[in-house]
Amino acid sequence: MTIREAVLDEKTLAVLIGFSEDWAAENSCFGYRPNEKSDIEGNRIFLAEEDGGAVGYLFGKVYPSKQMQSIMPEGTPYFEVEELYVVPERRSRGIGMKLFRYAEEAVKAEAEYMVLSTATKNWKAIFHFYLDELDMTFWSARLFRKIEK
Protein backbone atom coordinates (compact mmCIF):
# COMPACT_ATOMS: atom_id res chain seq x y z
CA MET A 1 0.00 0.00 0.00
CA THR A 2 1.15 3.53 -0.76
CA ILE A 3 -0.05 6.87 0.52
CA ARG A 4 0.51 9.98 -1.56
CA GLU A 5 -0.62 13.55 -1.81
CA ALA A 6 -2.72 14.02 -4.94
CA VAL A 7 -3.66 16.94 -7.14
CA LEU A 8 -7.32 17.49 -7.93
CA ASP A 9 -7.41 16.42 -11.56
CA GLU A 10 -10.38 14.78 -13.28
CA LYS A 11 -9.25 11.26 -12.35
CA THR A 12 -8.81 12.11 -8.67
CA LEU A 13 -12.11 14.00 -8.64
CA ALA A 14 -13.93 10.98 -10.09
CA VAL A 15 -12.40 8.70 -7.44
CA LEU A 16 -13.34 11.05 -4.58
CA ILE A 17 -16.87 11.62 -5.87
CA GLY A 18 -17.36 7.86 -6.30
CA PHE A 19 -16.12 7.15 -2.79
CA SER A 20 -18.33 9.86 -1.31
CA GLU A 21 -21.36 8.39 -3.11
CA ASP A 22 -20.51 4.99 -1.62
CA TRP A 23 -20.07 6.57 1.82
CA ALA A 24 -23.44 8.31 1.60
CA ALA A 25 -25.07 5.00 0.58
CA GLU A 26 -23.69 3.37 3.75
CA ASN A 27 -25.87 5.76 5.79
CA SER A 28 -23.23 5.66 8.52
CA CYS A 29 -23.05 9.41 9.25
CA PHE A 30 -25.77 11.86 10.16
CA GLY A 31 -26.37 14.30 7.31
CA TYR A 32 -23.62 13.06 5.02
CA ARG A 33 -24.23 13.70 1.33
CA PRO A 34 -22.04 12.93 -1.68
CA ASN A 35 -19.43 15.56 -2.43
CA GLU A 36 -19.44 17.90 -5.36
CA LYS A 37 -16.31 19.35 -6.91
CA SER A 38 -16.75 22.57 -4.90
CA ASP A 39 -16.62 20.55 -1.64
CA ILE A 40 -13.18 19.22 -2.54
CA GLU A 41 -11.53 22.18 -4.26
CA GLY A 42 -8.93 24.00 -2.19
CA ASN A 43 -8.25 21.01 0.07
CA ARG A 44 -5.06 19.02 0.37
CA ILE A 45 -5.87 15.49 -0.77
CA PHE A 46 -4.16 12.30 0.37
CA LEU A 47 -4.88 8.96 -1.31
CA ALA A 48 -4.24 5.41 -0.12
CA GLU A 49 -3.64 3.02 -3.00
CA GLU A 50 -3.34 -0.76 -3.22
CA ASP A 51 -3.02 -3.00 -6.24
CA GLY A 52 -3.11 -0.03 -8.62
CA GLY A 53 -6.29 1.55 -7.28
CA ALA A 54 -7.43 3.92 -4.56
CA VAL A 55 -8.79 2.37 -1.36
CA GLY A 56 -9.17 5.47 0.78
CA TYR A 57 -8.64 9.19 1.11
CA LEU A 58 -8.26 12.05 3.52
CA PHE A 59 -8.73 15.68 2.66
CA GLY A 60 -8.68 18.93 4.55
CA LYS A 61 -6.98 22.28 4.85
CA VAL A 62 -5.14 24.59 7.19
CA TYR A 63 -7.07 27.35 8.97
CA PRO A 64 -6.20 29.91 11.64
CA SER A 65 -8.07 29.06 14.83
CA LYS A 66 -11.05 31.19 15.81
CA GLN A 67 -13.01 30.77 19.03
CA MET A 68 -11.07 27.65 19.99
CA GLN A 69 -9.24 29.15 22.99
CA SER A 70 -10.14 26.19 25.19
CA ILE A 71 -7.63 24.11 23.22
CA MET A 72 -5.32 26.56 21.38
CA PRO A 73 -4.51 30.28 21.25
CA GLU A 74 -6.48 32.43 18.79
CA GLY A 75 -4.92 32.39 15.31
CA THR A 76 -3.03 29.13 15.79
CA PRO A 77 -2.80 27.27 12.46
CA TYR A 78 -4.50 23.87 12.46
CA PHE A 79 -5.31 21.27 9.81
CA GLU A 80 -9.02 20.51 9.68
CA VAL A 81 -9.60 16.94 8.49
CA GLU A 82 -12.76 17.36 6.44
CA GLU A 83 -13.09 13.69 5.47
CA LEU A 84 -11.29 10.41 6.09
CA TYR A 85 -12.70 7.41 4.25
CA VAL A 86 -11.56 3.84 3.61
CA VAL A 87 -13.53 1.41 1.46
CA PRO A 88 -15.45 -1.08 3.66
CA GLU A 89 -13.57 -4.19 2.52
CA ARG A 90 -10.22 -2.63 3.53
CA ARG A 91 -11.20 -1.22 6.93
CA SER A 92 -9.53 -2.27 10.19
CA ARG A 93 -6.23 -2.84 8.38
CA GLY A 94 -4.43 0.36 9.39
CA ILE A 95 -5.15 2.31 6.21
CA GLY A 96 -7.01 5.13 7.97
CA MET A 97 -4.21 5.46 10.51
CA LYS A 98 -1.60 5.59 7.75
CA LEU A 99 -3.58 8.25 5.88
CA PHE A 100 -3.88 10.34 9.04
CA ARG A 101 -0.19 10.00 9.94
CA TYR A 102 0.91 10.80 6.38
CA ALA A 103 -1.26 13.93 6.31
CA GLU A 104 -0.01 14.94 9.76
CA GLU A 105 3.59 14.69 8.59
CA ALA A 106 2.81 16.56 5.36
CA VAL A 107 1.21 19.55 7.11
CA LYS A 108 3.34 19.84 10.23
CA ALA A 109 5.42 22.71 8.83
CA GLU A 110 2.28 24.84 8.47
CA ALA A 111 -0.08 23.56 11.19
CA GLU A 112 0.25 22.95 14.93
CA TYR A 113 -2.81 20.74 15.42
CA MET A 114 -4.93 18.20 13.59
CA VAL A 115 -8.65 18.79 14.26
CA LEU A 116 -11.77 17.00 13.08
CA SER A 117 -15.44 16.56 13.79
CA THR A 118 -17.40 13.40 13.24
CA ALA A 119 -21.09 12.71 12.69
CA THR A 120 -20.79 8.94 12.63
CA LYS A 121 -23.57 6.79 13.98
CA ASN A 122 -21.01 4.26 15.30
CA TRP A 123 -19.41 6.55 17.87
CA LYS A 124 -17.83 3.74 19.88
CA ALA A 125 -15.77 2.55 16.93
CA ILE A 126 -14.82 6.05 15.84
CA PHE A 127 -13.80 7.06 19.37
CA HIS A 128 -11.63 3.95 19.58
CA PHE A 129 -10.00 4.86 16.27
CA TYR A 130 -9.36 8.53 16.97
CA LEU A 131 -8.71 8.43 20.73
CA ASP A 132 -7.04 5.06 21.24
CA GLU A 133 -5.33 4.41 17.93
CA LEU A 134 -4.47 7.95 16.81
CA ASP A 135 -3.97 9.36 20.31
CA MET A 136 -6.17 12.38 19.70
CA THR A 137 -7.71 14.28 22.62
CA PHE A 138 -11.45 14.52 23.14
CA TRP A 139 -12.55 18.15 22.96
CA SER A 140 -16.34 18.42 22.82
CA ALA A 141 -19.52 16.57 22.01
CA ARG A 142 -22.88 17.63 20.65
CA LEU A 143 -25.64 15.19 21.47
CA PHE A 144 -29.31 15.03 20.61
CA ARG A 145 -32.46 13.20 21.62
CA LYS A 146 -35.75 13.26 19.78
CA ILE A 147 -38.59 14.35 22.04
CA GLU A 148 -41.27 11.68 22.11
CA LYS A 149 -44.79 13.05 21.46
Predicted regions: what is each one?
Residues 21-49:
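Active-site rim helix/loop that mediates acceptor-substrate recognition in acyltransferases
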Residues 97, 120-140:
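Conserved active-site alpha-helix within GNAT-family acetyltransferase domains
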Residues 107-119:
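Conserved GNAT acetyl-CoA-binding A-motif
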Residues 59-79:
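Conserved acyl-donor/pantetheine-binding loop and adjacent beta-alpha core of acyl/acetyltransferases
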Residues 86, 92-105:
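Conserved acetyl-CoA-binding loop-helix of GNAT-fold acetyltransferases
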Residues 72-88, 141:
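Conserved acetyl-CoA binding element of GNAT-fold acetyltransferases
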Residues 47, 53-62, 80, 85:
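Conserved beta-strand in the GNAT
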Residues 1-16:
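A short beta-loop-alpha structural element at the N-terminal edge
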